[in-house]
Amino acid sequence: MRSHYCGDVNKSHVGQEVTLVGWVNRSRDLGGVVFLDLRDREGLIQVVYDPDLPEVFNVASTLRAEFCVQVKGLVRARPDSQVNGQMKTGEIEVLGQALTIINAADPLPLSMDNYQNNSEEQRLKYRYLDLRRPEMAQRLIFRAKVTSSVRRFLDSNGFLDIETPILTKATPEGARDYLVPSRTYKGQFFALPQSPQLFKQLLMMSGFDRYYQIVKCFRDEDLRADRQPEFTQIDIETSFMSSEQVMAKTEEMMRGLFLEMLNVDLGEFPRMTYNEAMRRFGSDKPDLRNPLELVDIADLLKEVEFAVFSGPANDEEGRVAALRIPGGAALSRKQIDDYTKFVGIYGAKGLAWMKINDLSLGLEGIQSPVLKFLNESIVNEIVSRTGAQTGDIILFGADQATVVAESMGALRLKAGEDFNLLQGEWRPLWVVDFPMFEKINGNFHAVHHPFTAPRGVTAAELEANPANRVSDAYDMVLNGCELGGGSVRIHNQEMQSAVFRILGITDEEAKEKFGFLLEALRYGTPPHAGLAFGLDRIIMLMTGASSIRDVMAFPKTTTAACPLTNAPGFANPQQLAELGIAVVEKAVKTED
């Protein structure tokens, strides 16, 4: 039905007859000549119909937006005065000689030109229309090219694309599972995988050595801009490779991808330990485009008569950190109050501040409600450590170390945006040396997952002092987003059992949930390591989209619903009966 895509016709085709198919993007009658912008996935082209062919002209005059049509005509160069530099095909146009309406379109339920006027609900309900917009189409085409590039790289490096099961068993990976009832085993359920973690480890035990898969994963969790209940991972696992080798190989892949797709050379990725990232940036995924840093000042404040500072300064689990914002002395009291409310979202009880109005005047040139608690030497040292200059403001976080990191880390990002401080377009890094465990409500939890290997300790040493152990794990971070995370895996039964016990998983529970893994570890398991990238997030960053919903063909809403298909829906009662499932409605209490 076509000889060319609309966006592929160019000056080299002048004088040729072409057959095009697509959708009417816009149609206008200017002085008895109909100009038609025809659109397909590759772009737009202008088609001109004049009254010399009355039958065709009359049909062209009836066209409306989103009619699906076939056009036949002659490619010709546009007059110089009509060249459109904003269009890929702006140097040429097609003189229409034939026109067939393949399918008419009813009046549209949403705006194609001013899509900002469409609600998110409308865009998802009529996704097949929303995806016709060039911006959306180009993102999905870009995504397809990225996955093709990734496959080429991994195939050429000896990785095997092997599928793993979708119907599997629930495992503790930090989020709720989506459950699928079994008809043949009444009362029992499959779980949709949150990742192929255990299966890819089993593939290493099976001797396949290098595995990859571009795979759907599922997590029933609260959603936000960069989360979806179903998402896609670039999943990688290797045998007989160290963490350094895995990082080198996947960094090579990512650098090659950016060079091929965006003509961007990311350069060599710097390394940063987890502790350094948390200390300097309050985040384990720091955005290095932002020059602001947290500075520890607790040692200066242990003796001050201001409990807000001295309390955390003398607490082993406390922290006092300063954040300098260049030019921040211009902030109004209301703006400072807004920042105070902002850090309160993250658990901070307040936000002390110090304006450097004129450094040459000493204390006289400094304005702060806490200045009366600080002597001149302390103030001078705070100014020196933060590098503050006249016109700056210093903001202070004082609380438990975790609260300070989270609240001041978030404030650092907000201030960086508010003051337009971001430098450079792409700043990647590796974050390494994560803790093995973190304590939540007195219990140990795995920072990554329970199959991550510790660095340089025996099972007995790990159990004796789990709190201070470092994992052989690594995260690739770009512009404050975690692109992917991985680790060396545990490859002996003794260590795996020790980790389970530290996590409060009894030997009996471990046998029930992970017996197959523990048994597999007895039969010559090779050392192995891997990494998983979030494909949706990578595409979002590379295309500049504001949400991963804009780089997925058919995403869910923030409430995990699909307006297009009205999923989820109620199940047929007969099917529920076959599954042995009864739906229990929650009783609503009424007041007398």
UniProtKB/Swiss-Prot annotation:
CDD domains: AspRS_core (cd00777), EcAspRS_like_N (cd04317). Keywords: Aminoacyl-tRNA synthetase, ATP-binding, Cytoplasm, Ligase, Nucleotide-binding, Protein biosynthesis. Residues 197-200 are annotated as: Aspartate. The keyword tRNA processing does not apply. GO terms for cellular component: cytoplasm. GO terms for molecular function: aspartate-tRNA ligase activity; ATP binding; nucleic acid binding. L-aspartate binds at residues 173, 219, 448, 489. It catalyses: tRNA(Asp) + L-aspartate + ATP = L-aspartyl-tRNA(Asp) + AMP + diphosphate. It comes from the Bacteria. ATP binds at residues 219-221, 228, 482, 534-537. One of its GO terms (biological process) is aspartyl-tRNA aminoacylation. It is found in: Cytoplasm. Coiled coil: none annotated. Homodimer. Belongs to the class-II aminoacyl-tRNA synthetase family. Type 1 subfamily. Catalyzes the attachment of L-aspartate to tRNA(Asp) in a two-step reaction: L-aspartate is first activated by ATP to form Asp-AMP and then transferred to the acceptor end of tRNA(Asp). NCBIfam families: aspS_bact (TIGR00459), PRK00476.1 (NF001750). This is Aspartate--tRNA ligase.
